[in-house]
A protein has these predicted regions:
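Membrane-proximal periplasmic segments of bacterial cell-envelope enzymes
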Residues: 1-314, 350-359, 699-702, 710, ...
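Beta-lactam-recognizing serine transpeptidase/beta-lactamase-like catalytic domain environment
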Residues: 72, 78, 299-316, 325, ...
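A generic structural motif
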Residues: 84-86, 654-658
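Solvent-exposed, polar/charged alpha-helical surfaces in well-ordered, non-transmembrane soluble domains
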Residues: 90-97, 101, 205, 209, ...
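Amphipathic, well-packed alpha-helical segments that form the structural scaffold of globular domains
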Residues: 286, 290-293, 303-304, 334-342, ...
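Structural motif corresponding to the C-terminal cap of alpha-helices
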Residues: 336-348, 426, 599
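Short, highly charged C-terminal tails/helix-capping segments
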Residues: 683-700
Length: 745
């Protein structure tokens, strides 16, 4: 390189260096400007974010039995949820159509509470509300008011407004109805940047996978785990446990008599789409079971980009409610009651009216704890939603909680109460007698009778209870008057609430103020007829009070409230004395003696049971009659055992059961189950979810269809080899119970 060329290169390099220095200077100046002059402004812009808070629903607490076995629990379900923050500029209705199609592919339902039908062939709509539902009527009224319509607006008017409001004119009529229903649900759930929208609940795993496969075309559509109520033992106390469900319109928006609107559940932290206890223990213990919801915070910057998602408040599960019942013992009592009713029908009720229903309640005498409360027929919590129509149409009323809400004439089971009243008041003593001639002739125009089964002549109170002598209790009841013996019956637990946590029938006693009162009604009431009606749980409470020598405890289902995570006892139900009859000397001992002799008058297992049982049967008349004019009869029973040191008390009713003594074997079966439970040898068939059985049956039927010829051959072979089976029939019932039905006409 010569000198000239070298100078050219140097000049060029110097020029490049100068240009680079100028550029660097400009960058440095710009950086200084940004940092020092506008630094605060840009920093604020960079950190300009918005936090959005979403509720994380807490798991509902469990309901367990006295041993800790779960009855009602929380399981994981999956909801299809729309998050408005993450949807971006996606066309909402197009996305909704896509989601609906995916749900339809998998036979899933989406939330649609709009009370309007699909369009008919002419494009017209009708309301689908129930005329008997005040909730539906209020929902329709609120919807019309919100849309600015008059209350006489038709379903077509409402749909027209919904289509216009949500700009659905371009869609076909069927799609207008679908999308209008979804938009209505969005409004109901207050869908917004801070409120996600639950579009479908408890979807299958197949649907979960389907939605996730289409996640790229469904921004903001999420699969969210949720807690759902499930029943590991759906057959245990379904009517007492109650149900959970959606918050209804009338509970969410409450209008008082002055027209003032309040939202009490919202003020307690509920959302419109939350689940809540709506009946039974689920409702009574809602505050304990509900738990505390958590909070998820999503942070979005000024450009709309989500920069952070975190749980800022961890949800706390609800507390566990522990019951006093042992689920195995409850199931054993359920089975014993069903077997007893079946036996009555097979052996005795061979005519036109079968024993189709009943109840049996077992209490712990020491503290009033409910050990079992059986209803027959009953229902399964796991089938309630799908089988509700069938249950509600069943004439045997499986949804009716007979144990707590059924009211029945007590019949001769009432006689021990009259005996207590007479002894405690001093009207009679252990030596007092009444001459039973078979006919009570005190009144000139009314001569009720007694069968004199096993007795006649002068009898004392112990003998009168043993043989259920009507004449004795007619005379004693007349001399006492209903005012006196009713007061004692009330203190013993009849005709009033027992104190259980859930809804129960009050019942009533026969009063002199009754419109149909006569002197004859007064003595009828003394043998448990008249206007007196009581519930099975009252009978059990009454029996327990007799066993406790006049001390009546509050009857209760709940043993304790537990911390779900640790099992720590947070509170425990203590025995609560509700009333006391002091007793005049040996009042309760004499009644006990009479009741302990009753089993010897009854055929069957109870007469030879190795443990002494104190009991009293009852056979009250029903209003219905045979063609001959003879009244149908219920079978009633109270009992406690062991008679000398009572542990349990029992109250039983069987509708159309005939004589009360027919429930004697049921008392023995309950006693056997109780003692087996105590020593750990009680064995019962485990609960099988009927939904699982249905699925297995469906699969089996598919297999059977392919093997029908072989099955038919096997059936013929089995039939040819089968030998006749002999049914063992219990000994006939020969007890005193005709006395209950022997009221002079």
């Amino acid at each position: 390189m010569n000198e000239n060329e070298r100078k050219v290169v140097v000049r060029r390099m110097l020029l490049l260096i100068a240009v680079a220095c100028i550029i660097m200077g400009l960058y440095t100046f710009r950086l200084i400007f940004l940092q020092l002059v506008n630094g605060d402004s840009f920093k604020a812009k960079a950190t300009n974010t918005t936090d959005y808070k979403f509720t994380v629903t807490a798991a509902r607490g469990n309901i367990v039995d006295s041993t800790g076995k779960r009855i009602a629990t929380t399981s994981t379900g999956y909801n299809v949820v729309l998050n408005k923050l993450q949807m971006g500029n996606q066309d909402l209705d197009t996305m909704l159509q896509q989601i609906v199609e995916l749900l339809r592919q998998n036979d899933e339902k989406w939330l649609d509470t709009l009370l309007i039908s699909e369009p008919d062939a002419a494009g017209n709509y009708t309301f689908t509300d129930s005329a008997d539902s005040t909730s539906d009527q209020k929902t329709l009224a609120d919807m019309k008011e919100t849309l600015g319509l008059q209350q006489y607006a038709t379903a077509n008017d409402v749909m027209e407004m919904l289509v216009e409001k949500n700009q659905l004119e371009s869609f076909s009529l069927p799609w207008q109805r679908v999308l209008a229903g979804i938009h209505y649900e969005m409004d109901r759930q207050a869908f917004s940047n801070v409120n996600n929208f639950i579009m479908a609940e408890n979807v299958s795993q197949v649907t979960v996978a389907t939605i996730k496969e289409h996640s790229l075309t469904l921004p903001g559509v999420e699969i969210v785990e949720t807690s759902t109520r499930s029943y590991e033992q759906g057959d245990i106390l379904p009517a007492v446990l109650g149900r959970v469900g959606k918050i209804t319109a009338e509970k969410w928006k409450v209008t008082d008599e002055n027209g003032q609107v309040t939202y009490p559940l919202k003020e307690k932290g509920y959302n419109m789409n939350d689940m809540i206890g709506i009946s039974g223990l689920e409702s009574v213990y809602e505050d304990e079971l509900r738990g505390k919801d958590g909070v998820e915070t999503i942070t979005r910057n000024s450009d709309g980009v989500i920069v952070d998602t975190k749980i800022t408040t961890v949800p706390e599960p609800g507390h566990t409610v522990q019951l006093t019942i042992n689920s195995d013992f409850q199931r054993a009592v359920d089975k014993a009651l069903a077997n007893n009713i079946d036996m009555i029908n097979r052996v005795y009720n061979t005519g036109d009216m079968k024993a189709a229903a009943g109840a049996a309640v077992v209490l712990d005498v020491k503290d009033g704890s409910v050990l079992a409360a059986a209803n027959y027929p009953s229902f399964d919590q796991n089938l309630y939603a799908t089988n509700y129509s069938e249950y509600s149409a069943d004439p045997s009323l499986p949804l009716f909680n007979r144990a707590l809400q059924g009211l029945y004439t007590p019949g001769s089971t009432f006689k021990p109460a009259v005996a207590v009243a007479a002894l405690d008041s001093g009207l009679i003593n252990q030596y007092s007698t009444v001459n039973c001639t078979g006919v009570y002739t005190y009144y000139k125009d009314y001569h009720p009778r007694c069968t004199r089964h096993g007795h006649s002549g002068n009898i004392d109170v112990v003998t009168a209870i043993k043989w259920s002598c009507n004449i004795f209790f007619y005379d004693v009841g007349r001399r006492l008057t209903s005012d006196v013996y009713d007061a004692y019956a009330y203190k013993l637990g009849l005709g009033q609430r027992t104190g259980v946590e859930v809804n129960e029938a009050v019942g009533r006693l026969t009063k002199k103020t009754d419109k149909n009162y006569t002197s004859s009604l007064d003595i009828q009431a003394a043998i448990g007829q008249g206007n007196t009606v009581v519930s099975p749980i009252q009978l059990a409470t009454y029996a327990a009070t007799l066993a406790n020598n006049g001390v009546r405890y509050r009857t209760h289902f709940v043993k304790a409230i537990l911390d779900t995570n640790t099992g720590e006892v947070l509170s425990e139900t203590q025995p609560e004395v509700m009333d006391i009859i002091e007793g005049n000397g040996n009042t309760f001992e004499l009644v006990r003696q009479g009741m302990t002799l009753v089993p010897s008058t009854i055929s069957g297992k109870i007469s030879s049971y190795p443990i002494a049982i104190a009991c009293k049967t009852g056979t009250p008349q029903r209003s219905e009659t045979y063609a001959s004019g003879k009244h149908y009869l219920n079978a009633m029973m109270i009992a406690y055992l062991p008679a000398d040191d009572p542990e349990i008390a029992i109250g039983i009713t069987v509708e159309y059961g005939g004589y009360g003594a027919r429930t004697g074997d049921l008392v023995v079966d309950i006693a056997n189950a109780y003692f087996a439970m105590k020593d750990g040898t009680l064995e019962v068939d485990p609960y099988v979810d009927p939904r699982t059985v249905a699925q297995e049956d469906a699969a089996a039927s598919d297999t059977a269809a392919q093997t029908a010829p072989d099955a038919a051959n096997d059936a013929q072979t089995a039939a040819a080899a089968a030998e006749p089976q002999q049914t063992t029939v219990p000994a006939g019932v020969t007890e005193e119970e005709n006395n209950d039905a022997m009221l002079a006409q």
